[in-house]
Amino acid sequence: NALVSNGTVKGSAVTVSGLEPGTDYIYQVGDGTNWSETREFKTAYETDKFSFSAFGDLQASSIAEMSRFLAAAKTISEMPERPLFSLNVGDIIDSDDRYDCYMYYGYLLNQRPEFANIDCVASYGNHEYMGNPDADNIKFANGHHSAVAAPDFDPELLGTGTYAVEYGNMLVISLDWEHRGPASPSEITQEYAKWMDKVLTEHADKTWKVVTLHYPIFPNA
């Protein structure tokens, strides 16, 4: 559960094993009595050619501004090929404690096939941490595992939004740049460097390495 200023966001997660690559699956979500409509998703296929979508700073501060999600969904729906995953580079919402916006956000993720039927790879921006210092809601929506402990680095300094995920011949690295760990910014940056060196070495065979974070590496201001 994630507490917000005017309610509690509750969610459940399920891990499914034994799935085959490049396969369509259908499912329903229910409580034993009430059930959703039948939904579908497709697992990643073993290929080096695929599409993905990317967006960021949708940052809705009101229900009216959630129309930005509909605009993003329209763009995704017009892609020649259904994207394998959707890359969100942060600030998907204005404040993590806005229960009303998260309710509508959850509705869109649930109802719009452009979001509901593809994987979500999310980086955490500063607004994910506003109103909720642990960014619980976006962590739940994201669903990818954080960096695990290793002798070479301290995962507490990396933040839970730091992780790597593979798609075909691509490696996607997300850095939790807004994370405020128990160390100085320079020490945290050093931990990122050590962790990335390990991950890039382990995935040297990947043709494409994509690093995503909410802030530009070379800001123009």
What spans do the regions from the language model cover?
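Acidic, histidine-bearing metal-coordination/catalytic regions of metal-dependent phosphoesterases
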Residues: 1-62, 74-83, 209
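Acidic/histidine-rich helix-loop elements
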Residues: 2, 53-71, 94-100, 181-188
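Extended active-site neighborhood of metal-dependent phosphoesterases/phosphodiesterases
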Residues: 24-40, 98-207
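Active-site neighborhood of phospho(di)ester-bond hydrolases with catalytic His/Asp-centered motifs
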Residues: 53-56, 85-91, 119-126, 175, ...
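Sec/Tat-exported extracytoplasmic proteins
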Residues: 59-62, 76-80, 96, 124, ...
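Short, solvent-exposed loop/turn segments at secondary-structure junctions
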Residues: 60, 93, 128-129, 178-180, ...
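Well-ordered alpha-helical segments embedded in enzymatic catalytic cores
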Residues: 68-75, 195
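Short acidic, glycine-rich surface-loop motifs adjacent to enzyme active sites
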Residues: 90-93, 203-221
